[in-house]
Amino acid sequence: IGISGIEADGTLRDYDYREVKVAQTIIGHAREVWLAADTSKFNRPAMVEVGRLDQIDRLFTDAEPPAPFPALLEEAGVKLHIALDKKETTP
């Protein structure tokens, strides 16, 4: 799933209530929930609550999350995956 923001208490949020309903359905029925969120989403508020970090199994992001998120992820049992920036080079 994707979201608009993750608050410092671990609340996952979005702006579009229709997208929230879809994300909540996915969370409720999936065997494993993967969240994709770049680092701009941390400490970013949004209007509608999607869920909480403890409902997520894996988080994919572009850099190490700021404090307090590493501790929150560990406490929630979320596996963190940081994408590497591999620039293509031409021979």
Kindly give the residue locations of the regions a language model identified.
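Conserved phosphate- and dinucleotide-binding cores of soluble alpha/beta proteins
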Residues: 1-91
